[in-house]
Amino acid sequence: MSDFARNRKALHDFDIEETYEAGIALTGPEVKSVREGRANLRESYVRVRNGEVFLVGAHISPYKNATNVPQEPTRDRKLLLHRKEIDRLAGKSQEERKTIIPLRLYPKNGLVKLEIAVASRKRQYDKRREIAKKTAQREIERAMKERLRR
């Protein structure tokens, strides 16, 4: 099965250093909404607070069939990780230019999992260099394809 939500902008704006798989504490209506694909990770990030890890700023639209349950779309959601992973993430997030970002929400054995990454923000010239590299690679592939046709 495919992902429920992806943070495609993160791959463009950040250099990914290491990734972790985390469980996410959701309410029942939130799980149903996520399974419908109504989650957005674009402006979200991960914060370590008091030895616990939270997903901040993720938007999960309210499930329309759950009327009697109050639903807050952008509340902070607790992430479920092992203590060693939490300590490692806390240390990494204290380093200069490092941040923890969500990459994707996906199903695993009937549960909703979140892939998070320790990343550093790309500078503008890094983005330009990457675009130039992709363009050059595309030109090479196009030339090779044209060469093979002859």
From Swiss-Prot:
One GO CC annotation: cytosol
Keywords: Cytoplasm, RNA-binding
One Pfam family recorded for the sequence: SmpB
GO biological process: trans-translation
Keyword Transferase assigned: no
InterPro entries: SmpB, SsrA-bd_prot, SsrA-bd_prot_CS
GO MF, any single term: RNA binding
Compartments where found: Cytoplasm
Family of the protein in this entry: Belongs to the SmpB family.
Entries under PANTHER family matching the protein: SSRA-BINDING PROTEIN, TMRNA-BINDING COMPONENT OF TRANS-TRANSLATION TAGGING COMPLEX
Annotated function: Required for rescue of stalled ribosomes mediated by trans-translation. Binds to transfer-messenger RNA (tmRNA), required for stable association of tmRNA with ribosomes. tmRNA and SmpB together mimic tRNA shape, replacing the anticodon stem-loop with SmpB. tmRNA is encoded by the ssrA gene; the 2 termini fold to resemble tRNA(Ala) and it encodes a 'tag peptide', a short internal open reading frame. During trans-translation Ala-aminoacylated tmRNA acts like a tRNA, entering the A-site of stalled ribosomes, displacing the stalled mRNA.
Name of the protein this chain belongs to: SsrA-binding protein
UniProt source species: Rubrobacter xylanophilus (strain DSM 9941 / JCM 11954 / NBRC 16129 / PRD-1)
UniProt lineage: Bacteria, Bacillati, Actinomycetota, Rubrobacteria, Rubrobacterales
